[in-house]
Amino acid sequence: MLKYRLISAFVLIPVVIAALFLLPPVGFAIVTLVVCMLAAWEWGQLSGFTTRSQRVWLAVLCGLLLALMLFLLPEYHRNIHQPLVEISLWASLGWWIVALLLVLFYPGSAAIWRNSKTLRLIFGVLTIVPFFWGMLALRAWHYDENHYSGAIWLLYVMILVWGADSGAYMFGKLFGKHKLAPKVSPGKTWQGFIGGLATAAVISWGYGMWANLDVAPVTLLICSIVAALASVLGDLTESMFKREAGIKDSGHLIPGHGGILDRIDSLTAAVPVFACLLLLVFRTL
């Protein structure tokens, strides 16, 4: 299993970096759309759609929805402050606040949505669509002036999330004693959680110094810590839905890593939340 995880990581990391820095806006949008379609395919299982045909239709409908939104906003990469994009990012904040309540009060909260495929599908839309626009909004930042400025921001969020996750794992292994959310994800501890946030703060400081980002350090730190918190919530939320669905992994598309959602669950929360804070709340970019 470890061998497959390492092989997948060595293949995926260069591919992700290449997609960030080499693809034009249209190419990046298409790749992100495909990733979202695969995520929708896996979310179908979390929503109670177990047959292959049902999940294929969900993936296709997701792709059509995102393609329609792109069609309605052909110049999004020149002006990311468009109503549809902003509504999607604000919706992500609302959804993740609701998700926090669902996780905090689980398993009691499951009584609200456990038997409703419609609600679980809505949760999926609120997870995938803002993630899609968060990715595109950050990548499109000042693209005409500097093709790589948006890629640097997106790479930062990814490093932040992966670094916080690694920090949480190490601190949890070394010092973990008190469970964070035992009914949702028994392996997570408060010590790991705090270690992850501390790691995120260090990354915020270090990356800000290296990349010379045109953002006040305090603003970057606030956005980064909130995004790191959101990444933990994204992980816990998917774990909650998987627990209700009775599955360990969301899929088997990535050898050694499970499914697409298993790899991007933290990013589905962190990316739109970070984008919303930076673009709309602080209006920094």
Curated annotation (Swiss-Prot):
Pfam families documented for this protein: CTP_transf_1
Compartments, record wording: Cell inner membrane
Membrane topology: Multi-pass membrane protein
Catalytic reaction(s) noted: a 1,2-diacyl-sn-glycero-3-phosphate + CTP + H(+) = a CDP-1,2-diacyl-sn-glycerol + diphosphate
Main location: membrane
Enzyme class (EC, first level): transferase
Keyword annotations from UniProtKB, A to Z: Cell inner membrane, Cell membrane, Lipid biosynthesis, Lipid metabolism, Membrane, Nucleotidyltransferase, Phospholipid biosynthesis, Phospholipid metabolism, Transferase, Transmembrane, Transmembrane helix
The protein's name in its UniProt record: Phosphatidate cytidylyltransferase
Organism of derivation: Escherichia coli (strain K12)
Gene: cdsA
